[in-house]
Amino acid sequence: MLSRSGLRGARLRVVSLTSQRRLLNHFITHPPEPIPPPPPPAPSSSPSPKQFTLAVKDNIATTIPGLPTTCASGILSKSYVSPIEATIITQLRARGAVITGKTNLDEFGMGSHSIYSHYGPVSQDTPPETSAGGSSGGSAVAVANGEVELALGTDTGGSVRLPAAYTGIIGYKPSYGMISRYGVIPYANSLDTVGFLSKQINPLKELIIGERGLWKEHDSNDPTSLTTAARKRCAAQRRGYRSRQGQTTELEGLKFGIPLEYNIAELDPEIRDAWAAAAKRLQDAGARIVPVSLPTTKHALAAYYVIAPAEASSNLAKYDGVRYGARDAEGASDASAGGVLYASTRGKGFGEEVKRRILLGSYTLSSEAMDNYFIKAQRVRRLVRRDFNRVFALENPLQERETFELSDLPEEVEMEDKWGPEEVDFLLCPTAPTLAPKLKGVMEQQPVDAYMNDVFTVPASLAGLPAISVPMKVATEGAAGLQLIGQYWDDARLLDVADAVAKEVRT
């Protein structure tokens, strides 16, 4: 955390890092001086919060002069200043956040490598010209380079966890509905979640489950923010964050599930070996490792890439040069024919990947495709959620526990307990199927092939579950992530256990 002298040091660091930022391209906007938190509204006997440096993904709205919100898109110019401030920005500034800038991303959060940006791709420093992951690649690089203590990202299908894995840091996606999305430019409303990136888990624990924990705060501006009554019900079913969960740091007695379906053919052998080694280390530390089955996993990625583009096509319809978006002058001068203004503005303002997903989403919502694609994808989503509920020992506090027959499970599933599937505390799997690829290779890759990077992160997003990526050791140079997934609203215990797991698997 920053003192006054630390704030002066942060100012000097901003200046010294300018050339590096140009090289790595991880910031879109960075003011000449860090922006300190606002002064308290009135004299108070309570001490001022400790300050910390914060980078903000540029699809999270800020009203601070000099910090426009661009979403890394040509359709929103750097002159656009949001009329509203995101709730999470207000909350963190009240807790001492010193904002150092807005970070680069895939346009509107659509991508897995932070290459689909109007301002150019994001690159890692070590190794050079390597993908930083996406879509929160800029935030991840800012943390990995030590420029900030904490960075904000958004996680729709893995956009915080994947960059964390590629850059060797912590990436945390809270339970859906815990953190307000108000002021976050939407990609897919039912999936978008504000996420956090850091080198340490303790700052995340302090923010989420500390004395002023964000888990307590309902935001009436966000219809997806869990109500105060629902938060109390969730906490009561978990027997209280601090009394039961917040104290558990030892691994002994915990049961981790290894999803059989995650051992896919596309999994890099080096990642597979690191996954097995991590499981062995946890077992040596007293944890129990058991196989579990999530049979709908094989359909999760396809369902995600139907649901998310469908929601995106609706959300981005307002960027037409009239209500939102920079109007194309050429199209405006020749707007006699119907739709010319819209077509010109959207055609020139949106990047190729965004246009690809808008077209895909518009088709799946059409009358001829709705039943075959969108409705079926929603059914898959319910099955994914059911699979998770079956394997976790804790119940989902927002759903009734479901009973089922053993005949529902595939014949090939092996179970230690023939009375039913193993019930586990957490699931353990890789965050990404490969190490971070070179940017050149990514840019030469077919766009649809890059969607495979989300195969391990998408299921938790579809179910709205908390998940965290921690660095794990691999045989060669490079970074890899180990993902822990918890039951809904089990965030406090997930953060505590992830802290213990990270210490075991980091070296």
Swiss-Prot record:
Residues 31-46 have a biased composition (Pro residues). It is found in: Mitochondrion. It comes from Podospora anserina (strain S / ATCC MYA-4624 / DSM 980 / FGSC 10383). GO terms for cellular component: glutamyl-tRNA(Gln) amidotransferase complex; mitochondrion. Subunit of the heterotrimeric GatCAB amidotransferase (AdT) complex, composed of A, B and C subunits. Residues 29-51 are annotated as: Disordered. The active site is at K57 (charge relay system), S135 (charge relay system), S159 (acyl-ester intermediate). This is Glutamyl-tRNA(Gln) amidotransferase subunit A, mitochondrial. Allows the formation of correctly charged Gln-tRNA(Gln) through the transamidation of misacylated Glu-tRNA(Gln) in the mitochondria. The reaction takes place in the presence of glutamine and ATP through an activated gamma-phospho-Glu-tRNA(Gln). One of its GO terms (molecular function) is ATP binding. GO terms for biological process: glutaminyl-tRNAGln biosynthesis via transamidation; mitochondrial translation. The keyword Mitochondrion applies. Belongs to the amidase family. GatA subfamily. InterPro entries: Amidase (IPR000120), Amidase_CS (IPR020556), Amidase_dom (IPR023631), AS_sf (IPR036928), GatA (IPR004412). HAMAP family: GatA (MF_00120). It catalyses: L-glutamyl-tRNA(Gln) + L-glutamine + ATP + H2O = L-glutaminyl-tRNA(Gln) + L-glutamate + ADP + phosphate + H(+). Transmembrane segments: none annotated.
